[in-house]
Amino acid sequence: MKKGINIWSFPMGTIKDSLSLAKDAGFDGVELALGAEGELSLKSTDKEILEVKKMADDMGLSLYSLTCSLCWDYRLSDDDPAMRLKAKDMIKRQLECAKLLGADTILVVPGVVNVSFSHPEKKVAYDVVYERSFEGLSELRPYAESLGVSIGLENVWNKFLLSPMEMRDFIDKLGSDYIGSYLDVGNTLYCSYPEDWVRILGKRIKKIHFKDYRVEAGGLHGFVDLLAGDVNYPEVMRALYEIGYDDWVSGEMIPNYKYHTDAIIYNTSYSMDRILGRK
């Protein structure tokens, strides 16, 4: 497996600063994110995106996956048809940017019933979210296939697709090799176990986030450093070997440290080496 890290794990700075730190800490690649503004955004030109790719290439780093900070603002399941259209347009641009960066996967939040930390006033019925999300992803499927970039649906605290069996069946119903799971092992622990998700989703897993979570803490405060929480990483690794997973695993460390913020990158790299059996 290849060891990467998500860009949101880094202290504030430029993309170049983050890539340099990732390289120094021993990562093989970085998962970047599109934003509304900034160096890499929905407004970035193809030329600007290719310059980011060259920067990473020059450092010997892969840009293997692309997420987007606007996924909670523009939702495939929104009550407003105009917002659903914006969500589809955003995902199309995310696919295009991923192709330019050399990434083979984008992270997508499949739909949102409700979420406490972003627009908590919005609540959409579960069956309606299912219908709208399925419709939107079905429309996006041919575009992903034409670019050769996969859409990875993340299990996240969106009160939707709450079990690995439901995620599996949703993916299978979409019927494309270019739509699969972006499995976040830490996000599963509030109601299930990541090793079950791994074994049930199997070949449908496109990419994986490594996080850790302390169940007794609860809420967003439960997220802790790798190996400091309740994720049974030895069992997760056994499950990954069983299904033959040999793709990227990305540390996603949120929140960052308050002081000596670069230390989280080095600590995460070491913990991932231990988890992966490199040390």
Where are the regions that the model predicts?
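Active-site acidic/histidine proton-transfer and metal-coordination neighborhood
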Residues: 16-17, 55-59, 76-180, 190
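Short, conserved active-site loops that position catalytic residues or coordinate cofactors/metal ions
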Residues: 25-36, 65-73, 110
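Glycine-rich, proline-tolerant flexible connector loops at the mouths of alpha/beta enzymes
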Residues: 33-53, 110-117
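N-terminal small/glycine-rich loop or linker at the start of catalytic domains
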Residues: 1-6, 64-76, 112-121
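A short acidic, helix-capping loop that chelates divalent metal ions and anchors anionic groups
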Residues: 36-40, 72-78, 114-119, 190-191, ...
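Conserved beta-strand positions in the central sheet of alpha/beta enzyme cores
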Residues: 31, 65, 107, 152, ...
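Short glycine-enriched, charge-decorated loop/helix-capping segments at active-site entrances
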Residues: 39-41, 80-83, 123-124, 221-227
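Histidine-acidic metal/acid-base catalytic patches
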Residues: 1-4, 11-28, 57, 102, ...
